């Protein structure tokens, strides 16, 4: 029976050591994989505060206020501190543990009476677990890597917050201009409507012309309502980011979107420049934490040796309690491998956690590469659309003037003029949106690469 148990234990330990070797190879391959992206990233200058390239002091203040007041970022900071406390707690197992106690008792014979017998005792104890197999060190390392991962989580939250603040800031700037342009359109159509009413009164126009002009006015007013609702939603988003309540004013004078100079994107920087992304750093840290946890759990097979010492004292009077000191020592050895079934499954659980962390890390690399690639493409398309929108607006202005002249000459209907004018006004709004889309797209690139990249000179 003992031989069978011994053989079973040997097989289990051998299997565990084999699994350890496989996980070690997998972990080293993952580190090598991250290293190649890190080396590519080092070839470029990185400006982490990319929003300052817009040279908008007001935007800078808004971002600073968000970093100071945002609740999601505050919660992420608390998570970082908590992980640090856990890491310190795990590290405490590497140093001796002290404890002490005192006790005073009084006894009296209730039958015979007399004086009470009073005694005072005290003890001071110390224990220390020898980390012969570095199990405790691996546990502490796992906790430290977990702390580093939460730091990167906070950086990811910060990165997302900044991107949201910048894009929402310029979204409101765009919507303000769209509202102003739409109000101009309403005035334009209202003027036409008034002219048609006067002509109708003079008998030189029919009622359908008045109806068509008024229809254009109402359509423009509905567009205005839509833009105002969108601005209110954007303001709500910005207020949430800045932690401002409805009765607190934004105190922001937004720029005109067409006057904002686009920073641009260096498209010569390869999409593989992703090592600065905090989410990837976080997944890499969690992978390291899981690996160290596997190492620590696998060492649960090995004996644990604990050294202990104590110093005890006693006396009948408090001031003489330290006159009698008794020292003691202890050596404890635990054999966890005897509980091999529990240890085995704990090892399996830690290995499964490692594999999950490895897959999450590998997925984060793929997602990041596709993220940058898609954002590059979106930026180039946004620039093209902005250029096309500007050209289209010029053509639409000409077409509107053409139909206006034809109407005034009596060879074209009002409907054709209004249709052309509506197309022109819409293309004017399209320019504003296209410019905002360029800013939004370039910020998506900066966010997905965690900074603005330029070639080192």
Curated annotation (Swiss-Prot):
TM spans (from-to): none
Pfam families named among the record's database cross-references: OEP
InterPro entries: OMF, OMP_efflux, RND_efflux_OM_lipoprot_NodT
One GO location term (cellular component): cell outer membrane
Membrane topology category: Multi-pass membrane protein
Location in the cell: Cell outer membrane
Disulfide cysteine pairs (residue numbers): none
GO molecular function: efflux transmembrane transporter activity; porin activity
Signal sequence residues: 1-23
GO aspect biological process, one term: monoatomic ion transport
Observed phenotype of the null mutant: Mutant cannot secrete leukotoxin and is more sensitive to clotrimazole, erythromycin, ethidium bromide, cationic detergents, bile-acids, anionic detergents and chloramphenicol.
Domain notes: The periplasmic domain interacts in vitro with purified peptidoglycans.
Family assignment from sequence similarity: Belongs to the outer membrane factor (OMF) (TC 1.B.17) family.
Subunit structure: Homotrimer. Probably part of a complex composed of LtxB, LtxD and TdeA, which forms a single transport channel across the two membranes.
Primary role: Required for secretion of the LtxA leukotoxin and resistance to various antimicrobial compounds.
Protein name: Toxin and drug export protein A
Species this protein is from: Aggregatibacter actinomycetemcomitans
